[in-house]
């Protein structure tokens, strides 16, 4: 690397660092930033006389520019040296002149915080800032519930740690921001940092932040080991993670790293590595510091789960109900040992929200077995070659005209090849026509051998169609054919459900069956939208589906003997007209309780509101039960429910 290129990279690294620390809006992934810093270090080690004083390797963070007051730390807050593999870890240990007795703990991916206590009282809280001076966020710190406001130690002490947002809370925060049309946080770390730096303390409070201590600054403690210091701190009332170890040697450190890496997905908060630290405080004092790092500790980083790459195209996938899902085609990138070439974009509203274009640089995250997704678009890096992503007009598979609802774009052709197999699997499933023995694998086998080519072809299957197919003997074939014959006698609402119409589930299908009978598919938009519980989106979906498929539905009527169940409700029941929500695990399937409630004139809803009359709860009931108690909705267990319906 030449000096000119080095200085350009210094400027780029500073730009990325300011965006990260000052605005909580990163312009590059951690992996991309780390790689750039490593390039700078290589040049600087080989050209010591040409090191720029502006290089990020020579400072902790940019000078603070914010609406918060500045507050000086009593002792400097240092960054940590990163190591990425065993050889780098052993090289660090050699420089630290230490081969034994290491303190290790998770490196949580959050925002660093310095707490100052005097006379046992919390007097201030500050961000890391540039290491010497941070932002005074004391008022927000008082809103973090798990930070003790009073401790049993009366001398002056700085307690330092990481503020994190749990993964579940992060998803809830972004869901709320999406509803308010606010920009989404790219990751929990940015959310934690942004939550600490709110001018409105009530926002900090509602974010449910957690503080995990990892060290001390100014103090008059007399311990000889860091592990003793941290035990003392946690005994004051601070949170302790369950993965904290003392390792006798580097082999044990490596074993602990592998163990912690397996827990990465299970931990409720994000981790990006493991902290490895010399436990002997006298040796730590002897080792001292570089310009930027303590020599006695390092961050043993995990493989990146988030990287920057370029979006080079869009593929369209057709789902069971005909919904078109846009999938981003990416320049291949290695994420935690997996080569990622695509990422879901969910729908076209998501494309608009992200304002993503073909040829954009994007940040891609992969978590466990979850499909990779794009979390951020680096618009500042656009080069003028980007292209808009337009809504498709024709189905990519069958070329039929698509229904464009804005958020959802759908193919209405139920014989479309890409949706046919999944349509058949849904059609014969337990909640639909309930054809015993015609499971997913059998459907795929029959489709592969062209024995099933349409939904109707199920009812034209013959004994000879199964002959020669693996696993089919006379008894099995006869049982399956008998099950198909029995399925001809089914309730109308099950048939409507089986068609897989977008937005039309079992409850809506029952309403259509009871309201219109076999003429349900010949109604107007106004007739649909006036049904209780139906909205414009449901009505539009019905109109478009029946417009395309009304003759097919009439053909089905010739194949099936559809029954219209009359719902006989007891108007004198104590639960007549009452709304129930069911949550948790009960002794019988939830559908049985639902049917009983409806037969007694009640209704079952999927969400709790002020209009809910009862919440029937079982074991492991979750947020619905909590919300019901907040709204003072009557909550009953199974025993109380049984007594209620007996009345």
Swiss-Prot record:
Domain (BRCT) ranges: 570-647
Residues the record lists as binding Zn(2+): 395, 398, 411, 416
UniProt-recorded Gene Ontology molecular function terms: DNA ligase (NAD+) activity; metal ion binding
Name recorded for this polypeptide: DNA ligase
Top-tier EC class: ligase
Family, as annotated: Belongs to the NAD-dependent DNA ligase family. LigA subfamily.
Record field: catalytic activity: NAD(+) + (deoxyribonucleotide)n-3'-hydroxyl + 5'-phospho-(deoxyribonucleotide)m = (deoxyribonucleotide)n+m + AMP + beta-nicotinamide D-nucleotide
GO biological process terms, semicolon-separated: DNA repair; DNA replication
Protein's organism: Campylobacter jejuni subsp. doylei (strain ATCC BAA-1458 / RM4099 / 269.97)
Active-site residues annotated for this sequence: 107
Keyword tags: DNA damage, DNA repair, DNA replication, Ligase, Magnesium, Manganese, Metal-binding, NAD, Zinc
Keyword set includes Cell membrane: no
GO cellular component, one term: cytosol
Binding site for NAD(+): 30-34, 79-80, 105, 128, 162, 301
Cofactor: Mg(2+); Mn(2+)
Enzyme Commission identifier(s): 6.5.1.2
Transmembrane segments: none
Gene designation per UniProt: ligA
Job of this protein: DNA ligase that catalyzes the formation of phosphodiester linkages between 5'-phosphoryl and 3'-hydroxyl groups in double-stranded DNA using NAD as a coenzyme and as the energy source for the reaction. It is essential for DNA replication and repair of damaged DNA.
